[in-house]
Amino acid sequence: MAKKLVAVVKLQLPAGKATPAPPVGPALGQYGINIMAFVKEYNEKSASQAGSIVPVEISVYSDRSFVARLLTPPAADLLRKAAGIQKGASTPKRTTVGTITRAQLRQIAQQKLPDMNANDIEAAERIIAGTARSMGIKIVE
């Protein structure tokens, strides 16, 4: 018999540095799963991506078991790193805080493609370009 899915919990945590403290503890504790087992598994899986925020999707089952699936870092995070900035513009349409090239845009789109609702790389590029525009990052050829 298949296990019954109870909940899907989505968290954004620093890679390799998850702890049982909030937000992890309260989010997972209410479903009765072993928090330390999750923290250990997450830190092992995300150790290679140190320094970035790595979203995780945790499927919790009725027998208190779980499956953690790592997603790609948020587009805004990848864009900030590519542009070499700390944060986006406070007034995006009026001010430009950084620039990225088309090649960098394509690389970010390729990295994000598995987690995006896009059919091809061009559609993914347009989505990432929109995120860049809303952050005040200009795309140059």
From Swiss-Prot:
One of its GO terms (biological process) is translation. Gene3D superfamilies: Ribosomal protein L11, C-terminal domain, Ribosomal protein L11/L12, N-terminal domain. GO terms for molecular function: large ribosomal subunit rRNA binding; structural constituent of ribosome. The keyword RNA-binding applies. Keywords: Methylation, Ribonucleoprotein, Ribosomal protein, RNA-binding, rRNA-binding. Belongs to the universal ribosomal protein uL11 family. Part of the ribosomal stalk of the 50S ribosomal subunit. Interacts with L10 and the large rRNA to form the base of the stalk. L10 forms an elongated spine to which L12 dimers bind in a sequential fashion forming a multimeric L10(L12)X complex. NCBIfam families: L11_bact. Forms part of the ribosomal stalk which helps the ribosome interact with GTP-bound translation factors. This is Large ribosomal subunit protein uL11. It comes from Chloroflexus aurantiacus (strain ATCC 29366 / DSM 635 / J-10-fl). The gene is rplK.
